[in-house]
């Protein structure tokens, strides 16, 4: 019954019934998992963490418990603890596939892609599922192992011919200038009436790229438009007002903020942030600066945005942060230490280079916590940037604005306005 409630997303019922069962017998790791995962689904990570820790205290030393605790710690941006949990799970069961995958994810998020490859490959040898093949391919991309990626892609295409994500993967590493084979396969797939909008959008982006390689501009443009229109259909609940509110609130919070009273770090801010719009040249600059022997190129680190979004889940939390004058030093030091500790997991000694473009939204916080960090703003011709964004596939509901010319234009205006605000505020 608990399993049925969980599948139906009746998470409060799962918690209530499971807690009753635990009163009779506390040595049931499956029950702890149901409770903890229900709290995760309810976005109550602190309660989930307490449940998994309680399970361990009651000698439920099972790989799944440590794995799920690791997932919670990762979502709380306690990366060091998460790594310990995943490794403990693998000590208990070296073939625990979810621990292998999640340890791979953790290493990948730190841009330790060679280490990530080890764990993804171990998972791949156990289960060559669509999910795991996808992770292996993406990690090969990150390591610039395009030949190896192509080999896995061919295996993927053979095993799962109806999966169109692999067609898009293939288009990223293939030049169609003198090759119509795969292009014809994709055009044939578009006749399949059973494909979802998500499936079709993958195909359309890949076909547009193929036509672009062949310099068939008209055909490429037609499929770019179809790809974006179809992709945008998949975001039924998208509300651009959320974007507008975030930009507006950021300006409101910092409008009268006195940076001279901000928390002073230990003057060891070995951080460089490259910010701007996607497709604005951040990758090229990342490669140039990252080539220096004293710099660790962290790629697009999730740390800054992740920590702030986790700690400031709602407007009440962020208002409390700014309403204290001066801001409580313990709150600042705790946040500072959490962010700094995670950046040091990229590399403990080198200067960490973070090219997450959207960190432009957090420049005010960067100046509070890391006043000595370097911030480099990439500012490419806005029309070229907009076209490049529109031509490329971005995943996730927060990127829905990239699939609509109207919202894309509005987002760029919001970005320009916020960057002007930071420039006037910080000089």
Regions found by a protein language model. Name each.
Residues 3, 33-41, 64-75, 98-108, ...:
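Conserved alpha-helical positions within TPR/SEL1-like repeat arrays
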Residues 24, 58, 92, 125-126, ...:
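Structural marker of alpha-solenoid helical repeat scaffolds
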Residues 28, 62, 96, 129-130, ...:
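Residue-level recognition of tetratricopeptide repeat
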Residues 157, 295-298, 302-325, 346-427:
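PAPS-dependent sulfotransferase catalytic domain
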Residues 217-333:
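PAPS-dependent sulfotransferase catalytic core
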């Amino acid at each position: 019954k608990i399993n049925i409630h969980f599948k139906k997303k009746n998470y409060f019922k799962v918690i209530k019934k499971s807690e009753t069962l635990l009163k009779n017998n506390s040595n049931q790791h499956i029950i702890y998992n149901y409770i903890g995962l229900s709290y995760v689904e309810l976005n109550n990570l602190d309660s989930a963490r307490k449940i998994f820790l309680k399970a361990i205290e009651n000698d439920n030393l099972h790989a799944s418990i440590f794995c799920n605790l690791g997932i919670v710690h990762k979502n709380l941006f306690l990366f060091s603890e998460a790594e310990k949990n995943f490794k403990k799970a693998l000590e208990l069961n070296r073939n625990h596939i979810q621990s292998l995958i999640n340890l791979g994810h953790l290493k990948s998020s730190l841009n330790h892609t060679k280490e990530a490859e080890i764990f993804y490959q171990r998972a791949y040898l156990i289960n060559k599922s669509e999910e795991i093949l996808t992770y292996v391919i993406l990690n090969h991309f990150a390591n610039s192992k395009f030949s190896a990626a192509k080999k896995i892609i061919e295996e993927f295409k053979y095993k799962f011919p109806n999966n169109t994500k692999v067609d898009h993967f293939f288009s990223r590493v293939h030049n169609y200038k003198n090759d119509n084979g795969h292009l014809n396969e994709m055009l044939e797939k578009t006749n399949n009436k059973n494909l979802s909008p998500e499936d079709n959008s993958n195909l359309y982006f890949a076909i547009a790229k193929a036509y672009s390689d062949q310099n068939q501009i008209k055909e490429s443009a037609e499929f770019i438009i179809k790809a974006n229109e179809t992709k945008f259909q998949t975001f039924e609940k998208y509300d651009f007002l959320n974007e507008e509110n975030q930009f507006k609130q950021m300006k409101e919070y910092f409008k009268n903020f006195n940076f001279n009273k901000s928390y002073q770090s230990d003057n060891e801010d070995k951080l460089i942030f490259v910010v701007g719009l996607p497709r604005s040249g951040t990758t090229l600059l990342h490669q140039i600066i990252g080539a220096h022997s004293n710099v660790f190129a962290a790629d697009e680190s999730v740390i800054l945005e992740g920590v702030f979004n986790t700690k400031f889940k709602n407007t009440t939390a962020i208002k409390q942060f700014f309403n204290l004058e001066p801001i409580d030093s313990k709150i600042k030091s705790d946040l500072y230490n959490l962010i700094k500790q995670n950046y040091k997991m990229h590399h403990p000694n080198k200067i960490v280079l973070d090219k997450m473009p959207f960190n432009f939204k957090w420049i005010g916080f960067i100046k509070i916590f890391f006043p000595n960090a370097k911030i480099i703003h990439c500012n490419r011709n806005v029309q070229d940037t907009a076209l490049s964004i529109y031509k490329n596939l971005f995943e996730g509901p927060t990127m829905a604005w990239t699939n609509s010319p109207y919202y894309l234009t509005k987002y760029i205006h919001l970005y320009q306005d916020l960057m002007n605000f930071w420039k006037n505020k910080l000089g």
